[in-house]
């Protein structure tokens, strides 16, 4: 499975290098990183307050449903949108950047899934 993720990331980066400008790539990567950083920050605030963290169930929300953490959203590339807090997959209107973003989301989701409990 890890080889598949690596292959997807390498292929997407190669395609993005030819199809998109460095500014577009930087903006898309920055947005994706900030989404996963917010998961860490939200979880850290709960722990800092000494509260018992809410039990988030992995893959308990479908695309378009309300969410709080990325790991709640079903789909390898699905993330919890920052502003509306709904599950989404689309990253960019540019198809190459969207593929790059979805690959990056899949990698980030493999890490953030540890914040959610399996059902």
Swiss-Prot record:
Give the tissue specificity. Expressed by the venom gland.
Tell me where the signal peptide lies.
Answer: 1-19
This one is known as Toxin ICK-11
Organism per entry: Trittame loki
Q: Cellular location of this protein?
A: Secreted
Reading the lineage from the top rank, the first entry is Eukaryota
Where it mainly occurs, coarsely classed, is: secreted
What's a Gene Ontology MF term here? ion channel regulator activity
List the record's Gene Ontology CC terms alphabetically: extracellular region
Q: Which family does it belong to?
A: Belongs to the neurotoxin 25 family. ICK-8 subfamily.
Q: What is its biological role? A: Ion channel inhibitor.
Key words, A-Z: Disulfide bond, Ion channel impairing toxin, Knottin, Secreted, Signal, Toxin
Domain remark from Swiss-Prot or TrEMBL? The presence of a 'disulfide through disulfide knot' structurally defines this protein as a knottin.
Q: Which cysteine-cysteine pairs are annotated as disulfide bonds in the entry?
A: 59-74, 67-80, 71-116, 73-87
UniProt key word Nucleotide-binding: no
């Amino acid at each position: 499975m890890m080889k598949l993720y690596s292959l997807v990331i390498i292929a997407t980066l190669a395609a993005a290098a030819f199809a998109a400008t460095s500014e577009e790539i930087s903006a898309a990567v920055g947005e994706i990183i900030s989404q996963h950083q917010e998961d860490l920050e939200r979880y850290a605030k709960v722990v800092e307050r000494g509260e018992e963290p809410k039990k988030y169930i992995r893959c308990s929300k479908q695309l378009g449903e309300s969410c709080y953490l990325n790991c709640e959203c079903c789909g390898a590339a699905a993330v919890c949108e920052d502003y509306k807090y709904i599950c989404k997959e689309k990253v960019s209107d540019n198809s190459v950047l969207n593929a790059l973003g979805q690959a990056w989301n899949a990698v980030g989701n493999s890490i953030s899934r540890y914040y959610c409990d399996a059902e």
